[in-house]
Amino acid sequence: MQTRYDLILGSRRFSNYLWTLISFSGGIGFLLAGLSSYLGVQLLPFGNTETIVFIPQGIVMTFYGTIGILLSLFLLLNISLNVGGGYNSYDKSTGAIQIFRLGFPGKRRKILLQYKIQEIKSIKLSIAEGLNPKREIYLQTKDQRQIPLTRVGEPLLLSQIEEEAVELANFLNIPLEGL
């Protein structure tokens, strides 16, 4: 096998779908409660909004509802554009490494980094435990640049990230640092 291809999951993670649904549902609820207090009409199918005074509670609920809906639309846009998604491609026959990621719309929506295997010094494994654990694999070039190879989001299991780093270092036939 001369080629290795790793897909990188971007913003199309389960947690993003869940937070989009939660913020949209909450936003609709708050917006309808605020509008109900303004119009004097029961817009919510549950609960009683007759006791909510428009100033100040109704205005605040309308504001929070609008913010919740806008946040859910932003998350939905991220999911549909797959921001952060892409691939890592390693081809031993041509000696090329390609790292591709998608970003936000604009001039630099598509990011493609290309390196030769000869330019790579090592695979670096960075592990930091604590309240916000960080477990990442980096491609370290001979000019000391570190290019992250792992996806953003929830950290992988320690055994899983170590196994991935060892497999990649063995495949590229370069040393592994930080293990």
UniProtKB/Swiss-Prot annotation:
It is found in: Plastid, Chloroplast thylakoid membrane. The keyword Transmembrane applies. It is a multi-pass membrane protein. Pfam families: Ycf4. Keywords: Chloroplast, Membrane, Photosynthesis, Plastid, Thylakoid, Transmembrane, Transmembrane helix. Belongs to the Ycf4 family. This is Photosystem I assembly protein Ycf4. It comes from Rhodomonas salina. The lineage of its organism: Eukaryota, Cryptophyceae, Pyrenomonadales, Pyrenomonadaceae, Rhodomonas.
